[in-house]
Design a protein with these regions (language model features):
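A generic structural signal for well-ordered coil/turn residues at beta-strand boundaries
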Residues: 103-105, 135-137, 163-165
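Active-site "cap" helix and flanking loop/linker of ATP-utilizing ligase/carboxylase catalytic domains
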Residues: 118-126
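Glycine-centered tight turns that cap/initiate beta-strands
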Residues: 76-79, 127, 165
Length: 193
């Protein structure tokens, strides 16, 4: 089943076959999403981003591992979920699939005290931005229980893997000392919530 299945009451898949329908869909949706051709400046930015991707990923991953280790030792943090940590349940699998010391740039952790301290932590950050995105050059954080999953009951949140204390972090390429300092002052504010 394709979302763009009908064109003038004709079922493309039934008339032309699954392969042709898929090819047409790829072409039409691709043109719709990015246009006939990319503009020169967009092409330049894409190429520049692609050329520096490996360097940025090394920094992302190094920062994430350092932040995960810092959070593990912090008294206001109840748990840290990052496959690069040796106590992660899938650490062995992560070693099979990822390059050594490059386990991605997203981690989650729990702030002791639940919802109140979690929201206080997010609101207290100065360097990191509160956004639901991932993969940016800057550090992004979100408290899903009070934002993206707020409309769900606590039981529904728990069923979807979101706890009241959970913070999701997409770690950026800023200097790690700046990231850690921001999280340290945020966790100190959360302690006083």
């Amino acid at each position: 089943h394709y979302p763009l299945r009908r064109q003038r009451q004709m079922c493309i898949r039934d008339r032309l076959g699954v392969n042709v329908a898929f090819i047409m869909r790829c072409r039409v949706e691709g043109l719709r999403d990015i246009g006939m051709c990319q503009n020169p400046f967009g092409s330049f930015n894409f190429l520049l981003g692609l050329e520096t991707l490996s360097l940025r990923m090394e920094r992302h991953c190094g920062n994430t591992m350092a932040l995960a280790r810092y959070l593990q030792s912090h008294p206001m943090v109840s748990w840290v979920n990052y496959p690069g940590l040796s106590d992660h349940p899938f650490h062995r699998k992560a070693n099979e699939y990822f390059r050594k010391d490059c386990y991605g740039a997203v981690l989650t952790f729990g702030v002791k005290g639940g919802l109140g301290p979690g929201t206080k932590f997010i609101d207290s950050l100065r360097l990191a931005s509160q956004l639901a995105n991932v993969g940016d050059a800057k550090t992004l954080v979100i408290h899903p229980a009070s934002t993206t999953h707020e409309q769900l009951t606590e039981a529904e949140q728990k069923a979807s893997g979101v706890s009241q204390d959970m913070i999701r972090v997409s770690v950026g390429i800023e200097h790690i000392d700046d990231i850690v300092a921001d999280f340290a002052q945020g966790l100190e504010e959360a302690r006083n919530a």
